[in-house]
């Protein structure tokens, strides 16, 4: 996949970024280099290789100490919403920002 200068400028416009032409050309080169690297990685045959959730386990003989997924504090919605400027039916009311 290769991007064009037009693609980079369009993406910058959609992201609401001001991108001068010199920077756009540099960004184009960087993005195309990145996509080239991704294509190289996708070309590698990984059949039979299990995914690594924690790669450090492959080089060190230690078990990662992950905490248990347990509730550590109670959430009291009323306490949090007490300081909100506007709440209705348990939801925060905010001004409309998109038409």
From Swiss-Prot:
Per the record, the similarity remark reads: Belongs to the GatC family.
Quaternary structure and interacting proteins, as annotated: Heterotrimer of A, B and C subunits.
Top class in the EC scheme? ligase
- The protein here is known as Aspartyl/glutamyl-tRNA(Asn/Gln) amidotransferase subunit C
Gene Ontology BP annotations: glutaminyl-tRNAGln biosynthesis via transamidation; regulation of translational fidelity; translation
Specify whether Protein biosynthesis is a keyword of the entry.
yes
Residues in a coiled coil are none
User: Per its database record, what is this protein's job?
Assistant: Allows the formation of correctly charged Asn-tRNA(Asn) or Gln-tRNA(Gln) through the transamidation of misacylated Asp-tRNA(Asn) or Glu-tRNA(Gln) in organisms which lack either or both of asparaginyl-tRNA or glutaminyl-tRNA synthetases. The reaction takes place in the presence of glutamine and ATP through an activated phospho-Asp-tRNA(Asn) or phospho-Glu-tRNA(Gln).
Keyword check for Electron transport, yes or no: no
Show the catalytic activity.
Answer: L-glutamyl-tRNA(Gln) + L-glutamine + ATP + H2O = L-glutaminyl-tRNA(Gln) + L-glutamate + ADP + phosphate + H(+); L-aspartyl-tRNA(Asn) + L-glutamine + ATP + H2O = L-asparaginyl-tRNA(Asn) + L-glutamate + ADP + phosphate + 2 H(+)
Q: Which GO terms describe its molecular function?
A: asparaginyl-tRNA synthase (glutamine-hydrolyzing) activity; ATP binding; glutaminyl-tRNA synthase (glutamine-hydrolyzing) activity
Q: What is its EC number?
A: 6.3.5.-
The record's section on Pfam families has: GatC
Keywords of the record, alphabetical order, are: ATP-binding, Ligase, Nucleotide-binding, Protein biosynthesis
User: What gene name does this entry carry?
Assistant: gatC
């Amino acid at each position: 996949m290769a991007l064009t200068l037009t693609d980079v400028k369009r993406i910058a416009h959609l992201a609401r970024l001001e991108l001068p032409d010199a920077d756009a050309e540099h960004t184009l080169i960087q993005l195309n280099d990145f996509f080239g690297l991704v294509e190289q990685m996708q070309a590698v045959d990984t059949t039979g290789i299990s995914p690594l959730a924690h790669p450090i386990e492959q080089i060190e003989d230690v078990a990662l100490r992950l905490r248990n997924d347990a509730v550590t504090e109670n959430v009291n919605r009323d306490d949090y919403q007490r300081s909100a400027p506007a709440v209705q039916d348990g939801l925060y009311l905010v001004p409309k920002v998109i038409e």
